[in-house]
Amino acid sequence: TRSRRPEPERSDRLRTEAAEAISRGAAERNPGRSPRALNRISLPDSPVRLPDADVLFRRALGDRAGGRALGRLGEAARAFEDERFQDARRILNQLVERTAEVPEVLELLGLVHYRMGHWRAGAKRLEAFRELTCSTEQHPVLADCYRAQRRWDDVEVLWVELRDASPSAP
């Protein structure tokens, strides 16, 4: 069997990759026209604490179907870890149709789209994750989606939010 990488290492690698891409994007930035930043809700001082995916699936679908949906989310996560992004996207698209209020589904689907280079779709799902959780956790990836679309104002807004949410912020 294939050994799994520890979760923090993979998460750090993805964040580092996104931060490097944004640094490259700063060099590409053209002072020409850029679409206006989206009108976003302001984030509270701390993220919203939501129930686990298992609870949300069971609330939305019932005990039996909720348990199956949780298993499918696990399958999608394994496909993502193995870089089988098409498989992960297929599973997650089925889940998001029925359970768009489960942040783990939105987050993973946004990351799948990001890794596939589907910037607009990735941004859509990660924005939904941001609104639902009030978290800045995926801001580097979301900002890179906007950088790829040359939406510089959105990139700037996200970096300001991330800076303001940082524990070392003044």
What residue spans do the PLM features occupy?
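TPR alpha-solenoid repeat register
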Residues: 105, 138-139
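Coil-to-helix interface segments in alpha-helical RNA-associated scaffolds
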Residues: 149-156
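Alpha-helical segment of the N-proximal tetratricopeptide repeat
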Residues: 62-97, 108, 114
